[in-house]
């Protein structure tokens, strides 16, 4: 498979590649992670032509039952140009796309429903640039450096388990798929990742 796209982020073993202009279908992602196996020789804003097989990668192996991510294994790549504009991020929040608020995947993967199923929603933006609008932390930074947030300071989550203290509680019919994990991926960020408390307001977060 061959694609020509713009590099949006570089990791230690690959990079993220996204179409400058999407196809207009909100059910499908316009980006993919390109696996190189070692530090790639590309930079953010490079336009890349890359070829290789498409694979489903299971973090930790298939025996872990972790959910897979789609990746392109880089067999050949060419830098076509540099300094290109990055694709506009998808807004996650009230002024863009709203995440589902109750269901993760009630149909056991039999129906692809990104409007109502949290699992399908996040697959539809997999590997893409996104902005979590007016994010608020619903848990303190954990020992792995991860921060869990909701958009719009939880305004849309108030009826979906947001407590007075700012934590997000589950219920028998509400598993809060709107909770978004922000992770400091080694080598991507050029600043110190913050340590936050519940209720911290982070503003718009793009990644």
Residue ranges and their predicted role:
Residues 1-206:
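Extended non-catalytic accessory segments flanking core domains
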């Amino acid at each position: 498979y061959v694609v020509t796209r713009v590099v949006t982020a570089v990791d230690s073993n690959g990079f993220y590649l996204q179409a400058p202009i999407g196809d207009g279908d909100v059910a499908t992602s316009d980006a993919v992670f390109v696996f190189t196996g070692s530090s790639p020789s590309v930079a953010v804003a490079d336009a890349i032509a890359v070829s290789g097989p498409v694979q489903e990668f299971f973090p930790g192996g298939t025996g872990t039952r972790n959910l897979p991510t789609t990746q392109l294994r880089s067999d050949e790549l060419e830098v076509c140009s540099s300094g290109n504009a990055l694709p506009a991020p998808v807004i996650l929040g009230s002024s863009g796309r709203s995440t589902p608020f109750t269901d993760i995947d009630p149909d056991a993967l039999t129906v692809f429903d990104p409007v109502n199923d949290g699992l399908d929603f996040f697959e539809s933006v997999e590997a893409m640039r996104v902005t979590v609008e007016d994010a608020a932390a619903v848990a303190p930074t954990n020992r792995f450096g991860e921060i869990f947030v909701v958009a719009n300071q939880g305004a849309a989550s108030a009826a979906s388990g947001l407590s007075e203290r700012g934590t997000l509680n589950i219920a028998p019919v509400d598993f809060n798929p709107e909770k978004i994990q922000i992770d400091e991926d080694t080598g991507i960020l050029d600043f110190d990742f913050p340590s936050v408390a519940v209720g911290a307001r982070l503003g718009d977060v793009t990644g």
